[in-house]
Every structure is written in structure tokens, then in C-alpha cells.
Amino acid sequence: MDLHNIREDYSKQELSQAHCHADPIQQFEQWLEEAITAKANEPTAMNVATVLDGKPTSRIVLLKEVNPNGFVFFTNYQSRKGQAIEQNPYVALTFFWAELERSVRIEGRIEKISAEQSDNYFAGRPYTSRVGAWASNQSQVLSSKSELVAKAALIAAKHPLHVPRPPHWGGYIVLPERIEFWQGRPSRLHDRICYRLVEGAWHKERLSP
């Protein structure tokens, strides 16, 4: 399959270092709001990259909260990503909003949020999603789809109203140490503004594309 001639020439906007917020979290929130306003497809979807036994893996996960400390998502702690995080608590996140010709890359340390925070989020999930969190042994081999459906039915019968949060399911927060904002530009002269956390303070700089 020849893909040599598939390319886009970006030209919608530019990114000025002077106009970027001093705090990259605020800059991210602005870009995320603009992606939502522009009706970007799945604006909160992000690639989460981890390393397990020295080998990188990645998957798409939905961002569920941004706060001054970092970026929060929820998952099964016993999943492959959970095992990787337990072994190596450093991850990378990537957002891509094609509609705005923008990308954000985030690198940092990851840790679990409190059980209370996970409980509060889990309680607000749809009933079927709460059942699914119990039914799925995420990343484990299934003999058939019917096995999963049957297990979900049993859990629903056991918990017809209130489904408690599984102890192996909850939230993580990524505490950023490096955040890069990328804006596509003509002739591949893209804008890249990078923030690095140095001794507790954010340093902002422009990178060559």
C-alpha cells in the first residue's frame, strides 16, 4: 500500500508563545474548550502510553477531569495498563484535535486518586457501566462473548439498584512535568510551545518543528 502522497497542509491558526498562558494547565483548558466548541470528534479522548517490562504500549482512554494538579482518568487497576503503571509510574498522554490542527503531549508521573474520589465518580456512572466494571476482567482472555454477557447478567441480578465500586477499579491522576502544544502550520513550519516543570515552576519555550 503506497501512502506517500497522503498529506495535509495545515493553515488554520498559529500559536504565539507570547499569547500562551503562563500555566500550561490553563492553556490546555482553553484548547480543550475550543475543541469542544468546534465539535471535535471525541475531544476528551487521549492516547495513554505506558511501559511494561521495558516495552511501550498505548491505548485510547477518556479524560474525565482536569484540575490544577493534573489530568484524571478511570480504569481497571488490574488491566494491562494498571500493571504497567504499578511497575513504572511514568506515562505520556497525547490529544489530537484534527478539526483544529492541534495536538497536546503530556509527560509525567501517575498515581491513584483517593478511594472517596473514585467512589464519587463511579456512583455517577450509568448503571450498565457500573455492572460492566464488575463483569470485565480487563485484558484477560475470554472463552467467548457469551461468557462476558452471562457474567454481567449475574451481577445485574445481584445488584438490581446499587452497584458498589469494585476495589480493583478507580481513578489515576497524571501529574505533568512536561506539556507540549502543537499547532499545524503551512510548509511543515509548525508551532511547538513546550512547558517544562523545573523546581516547581513552569518554563515555557518554543521548539523547532
Curated annotation (Swiss-Prot):
What pathway annotation does it carry?
Cofactor metabolism; pyridoxal 5'-phosphate salvage; pyridoxal 5'-phosphate from pyridoxamine 5'-phosphate: step 1/1; Cofactor metabolism; pyridoxal 5'-phosphate salvage; pyridoxal 5'-phosphate from pyridoxine 5'-phosphate: step 1/1
How does the cofactor attach, per the note? Binds 1 FMN per subunit.
Swiss-Prot/TrEMBL cofactor(s)? FMN
Q: Which Pfam families match?
A: PNP_phzG_C, PNPOx_N
Listed PROSITE patterns: PYRIDOX_OXIDASE
Gene Ontology terms: biological process:
pyridoxine biosynthetic process
Could you confirm whether the keyword Phosphoprotein appears in this record?
no
Q: What's its top-level EC category? A: oxidoreductase
Q: Which UniProt keywords apply?
A: Flavoprotein, FMN, Oxidoreductase, Pyridoxine biosynthesis
Q: So where does FMN get bound? A: R59, I60, V61, L62, L63, K64, F74, T75, R80, K81, Q138, S139, W182, R192
Q: How does it assemble?
A: Homodimer.
**Family to which this protein belongs:** Belongs to the pyridoxamine 5'-phosphate oxidase family.
Name of the protein in its database record: Pyridoxine/pyridoxamine 5'-phosphate oxidase
Q: What is the species listed in this Swiss-Prot or TrEMBL entry?
A: Actinobacillus pleuropneumoniae serotype 7 (strain AP76)
Give the lineage: Bacteria, Pseudomonadati, Pseudomonadota, Gammaproteobacteria, Pasteurellales
